[in-house]
C-alpha cells in the first residue's frame, strides 16, 4: 500500500526519465492529477490522460529535448512529507534556481505554483520543487 502518493508519483517520473521511457503510469488521485496538470502547464511534460487500461491510473507522457533525448525535468524534489510538513507564507516561498524552477504548494485555494501563490498572496504547504 502506498502511503505517500506524491512521493510515489515523483519517484516514478524520475525513474522513467532515467531509463528514457516515453510514458509513465501513476495513481489517479486528485492531488496527483492537479500536480501533473501543473507540470504540463509549465512545460515539463507532454500530456496527462486517464489510462485506457484502468481508471485508477494516470498516463503521463514525458517530454524530451533535442535528438539526444535530454529529460525535460532535471530534478524533482519532495519538500514536505507525511512525517514532516513544511509551510510557508507567500512572502517566504523559496525561489528555485532564481525563478527558473517551480515550487508546487497546497494552499487554501487549491494546488498552485509559487508564482500563482505570490500573485494571490496565499501561503501553504510546500509539496515539491521541480527544475
Swiss-Prot record:
Entry's Gene Ontology BP terms: translation
Name of the protein this chain belongs to: Small ribosomal subunit protein uS8c
Protein localization: Plastid, Chloroplast
Main location: plastid
SUPFAM superfamilies membership: Ribosomal protein S8
Assembly behavior: Part of the 30S ribosomal subunit.
Species per Swiss-Prot/TrEMBL record: Tupiella akineta
Sequence similarity: Belongs to the universal ribosomal protein uS8 family.
GO molecular function: rRNA binding; structural constituent of ribosome
Gene3D superfamilies, per the entry: 3.30.1370.30, 3.30.1490.10
Keywords, in A-Z order: Chloroplast, Plastid, Ribonucleoprotein, Ribosomal protein, RNA-binding, rRNA-binding
Reported function: One of the primary rRNA binding proteins, it binds directly to 16S rRNA central domain where it helps coordinate assembly of the platform of the 30S subunit.
Presence of the UniProt keyword RNA-binding in the record: yes
Domain of life: Eukaryota
Lineage: Eukaryota, Viridiplantae, Chlorophyta, Ulvophyceae, OUU clade
Gene Ontology CC, one term: ribonucleoprotein complex
Keyword Metal-binding: no
Pfam families registered for this protein in UniProt: Ribosomal_S8
